[in-house]
Regions:
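Extracellular secretome segments
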Residues: 133, 142-145, 151-154
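Heme-based O2/NO sensor domains and their adjacent alpha-helical segments
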Residues: 2-13, 26-107, 111-114, 118-137, ...
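Short, solvent-exposed beta-strand/turn "edge" segments of beta-rich domains on protein surfaces
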Residues: 18-23
Length: 155
């Protein structure tokens, strides 16, 4: 029995590898992060710059996109991300602005013309921000989103 050929439209590499690993993801996250403190919708959510935020978001995305599981193994995993968002009361306009600014960071990191990558990243960010909005507004554990582990995003 021979295996079916791979779909040539789907890259063989992980999204993490396609992004350039930690270096590429850090470029995206840094570009995004630099923009949020000037934004009137997002600045109230983020407050002031935190030295570890770029590292933590990079590690989260690396794991989500098929890279090493550092966020889970070293930084507290999904329970940590839930605790970070709890009580922030993120609104739908803030969620949408987060996605918009994140995708602008993707573009500034030289992925503006990479439509499959942009589509995959946007889908992951949309999904994650929808979870964040639920968790940030939950007043009890029963109101938290049912997602309890970092999702693994593929093409």
């Amino acid at each position: 029995m021979t295996p079916e050929p791979l779909d040539p439209a789907i890259p063989a590499e992980t999204v993490y590898e396609h992004a350039g690993g930690d270096v590429g993801l850090r470029a995206i996250v840094s570009s995004f992060y630099d923009s949020i403190f000037e934004d009137p919708l997002l600045q109230p959510v983020f407050g002031h710059p935190v030295a570890t935020h770029v590292d933590h978001l990079t590690a989260f995305l690396a794991e989500e996109f098929g890279g090493p599981a550092r966020y889970t193994d070293e930084l507290g995993g999904f329970p940590k991300i839930v605790s970070v968002h709890r009580g922030r009361k993120i609104t739908e306009p803030q969620r949408q602005r987060f996605v918009e600014l994140f995708m602008a960071g993707v573009d500034r990191a030289s992925f503006a013309d990479d439509l499959p990558f942009r589509k995959t990243v946007k889908s992951a960010i949309e999904f994650g921000t929808r979870i964040a909005i639920v968790n940030s507004n939950a007043t009890t554990d029963d109101e938290l989103h049912p997602q309890r582990v970092i999702p693994h995003w593929r093409w």
